[in-house]
C-alpha cells in the first residue's frame, strides 16, 4: 500500500467516526451525561504527593507548553480525595501501617538479644554487621587464591578468635538489657 492509500483510509475512518457520533443517539446521551455529571467539579491543575500519607490537590497554574493540551481543558477530574484513595490504594492516610512492621522487627531484635540468641540477633541487623563478622571468622573469603596449589574443599578454616564483649555481656542480664535498649533506640529513630 502506498502512503496516499493509507491517508485515504485514515480520512475515511475519521469521517465514519464523526458520522457515528452525530447519528448514534446513545453515544450523544452518554457524552452529555458525562459532561453534566462533572459540570460542577473543578478541574485539577496539579497533583502534589509529598509522602504516602500526605496527598494534596493544588489549583496553581501549570506550566504551559504549546504542544501539550492544557490540563484544565481536560475532562478528567476527581470528585473527592476519598475517591482517589480508593482508586489508588497505596495512598493511605493511616501511618500506623508503616510503624507496625518496624515495631515488630525491633521487638524480635530485642527478644533475640534478651534470650542470648546472638546469631539470630546478628541476622536481624543490617547485612553489614553480618559481613564484618564473616570476614573476621573466615578470612579466606576476603580474597581469591591465585596459586596453583591444591586447596582442600573446606576453604574456610573459621578461626573465630573474636575478642568481643558482646559474647560476655550476653551472660549478664543487665548488660544484655542495656544493649537491647540501645538497639531499640536506633530502630525507633
From Swiss-Prot:
One of its GO terms (biological process) is regulation of Wnt signaling pathway. Pfam families: MDFI. Residues 28-188 form the MDFI domain. One of its GO terms (cellular component) is nucleus. It comes from the Eukaryota. Belongs to the MDFI family. This is MyoD family inhibitor domain-containing protein 2. It comes from Homo sapiens (Human).
